[in-house]
């Protein structure tokens, strides 16, 4: 079972806020009245007695202490910036396993926490953006991929591992090779929209599949990983609960935000690796 942290955070803020409000409306006036009554009965009030009469219930004390901190975290995380950790190599070489990234939560519109309803439209995903979204088949799981197809686009991926968008071959330039799990891996520089970035292909690894083509419906996006032969993305999703014409598509309501920076790397196992900052920088 996946932990729904946004829901837990909202509940925690609501509980702490309710405790603070109950104290303000109910308990605090009672404490003030008790202190006033005591002071009217003695000539010299005992500081220890005053402290005892003014003491907040322990639960209220904790609630009032945690409320401002949790509220600030909720606002920052829900509407401004949210941190994520990269769990897989599907976005290599752009993102490595163990990278900690920052995601802009307002780039594509302000959304209500937990409900994820867009209340203030600000912008739309652009081709080439690196985007975090909730996996359509399991919305409690966050994925990160690159936006390849926009609403209305036609995307084609060939058995030769070439990408076409709206009938045009996406430009790519050979960069070099690096070691891979099954032989060498070829690196290319690809340009999607205004975004230039590196992609990885295992040219010696052939997939027995025909050329495939998709037309992106309104309000949906087609996503691919930069590690083209090691990415579970829009090309391969298959869920019988999803209509056939929407298979592989990410609906706008599932968008979490735009990934824009790496702020730390800490690969597993954490106990035998130290955090490092050599990969800190903007995500292209």
From Swiss-Prot:
Its main location: membrane. GO terms for molecular function: peptidase activity; serine-type endopeptidase activity. Residues 78-284 are periplasmic. Disulfide bonds: none annotated. Residues 23-58 are cytoplasmic. PANTHER family: CHLOROPLAST PROCESSING PEPTIDASE, SIGNAL PEPTIDASE I. InterPro entries: LexA/Signal_pep-like_sf, Pept_S26A_signal_pept_1, Pept_S26A_signal_pept_1_CS, Pept_S26A_signal_pept_1_Lys-AS, Pept_S26A_signal_pept_1_Ser-AS, Peptidase_S26. It catalyses: Cleavage of hydrophobic, N-terminal signal or leader sequences from secreted and periplasmic proteins. Belongs to the peptidase S26 family. This is Signal peptidase I. It is found in: Cell inner membrane. The active site is at 90, 145. It is a multi-pass membrane protein. The keyword Transmembrane applies. The chain crosses the membrane at residues 4-22, 59-77. Keywords: Cell inner membrane, Cell membrane, Hydrolase, Membrane, Protease, Transmembrane, Transmembrane helix. One of its GO terms (cellular component) is plasma membrane. Its EC number is 3.4.21.89.
């Amino acid at each position: 079972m996946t932990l729904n942290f946004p829901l837990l955070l909202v509940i925690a803020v609501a509980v702490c806020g309710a405790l603070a409000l109950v104290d303000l409306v109910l308990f605090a006036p009672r404490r003030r009245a008790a202190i006033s009554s005591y002071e009217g009965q003695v000539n010299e009030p005992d500081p220890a007695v005053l402290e005892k009469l003014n003491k907040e219930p322990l639960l209220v004390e904790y609630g009032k202490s945690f409320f401002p901190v949790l509220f600030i975290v909720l606002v920052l995380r829900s509407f401004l910036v949210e941190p994520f950790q990269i769990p897989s190599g599907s976005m290599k070489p752009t993102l490595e396993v163990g990278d900690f990234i920052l995601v802009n939560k307002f780039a594509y519109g302000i959304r209500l926490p937990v409900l994820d309803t867009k209340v203030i439209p600000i912008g739309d995903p652009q081709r080439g953006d690196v985007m975090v979204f909730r996996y359509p088949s399991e919305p409690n799981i966050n994925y990160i991929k690159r936006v390849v197809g926009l609403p209305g686009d036609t995307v084609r991926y060939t058995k030769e591992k070439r990408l076409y968008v709206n009938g045009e071959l996406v430009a790519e330039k050979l960069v070099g090779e690096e070691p891979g799990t099954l032989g060498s891996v070829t690196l290319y520089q690809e340009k999607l929209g205004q975004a230039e970035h590196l992609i990885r292909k295992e040219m010696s690894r052939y997939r027995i599949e025909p050329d495939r083509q998709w037309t992106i419906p309104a309000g949906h996006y087609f996503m691919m990983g930069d590690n083209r032969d090691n990415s579970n993305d829009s090309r391969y999703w298959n869920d019988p609960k999803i209509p056939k014409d929407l298979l592989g598509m990410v609906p706008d309501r599932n968008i979490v935000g735009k990934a824009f920076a790496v702020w730390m790397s800490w690969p597993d196992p954490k106990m035998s690796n130290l955090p490092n900052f050599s990969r800190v920088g903007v995500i292209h």
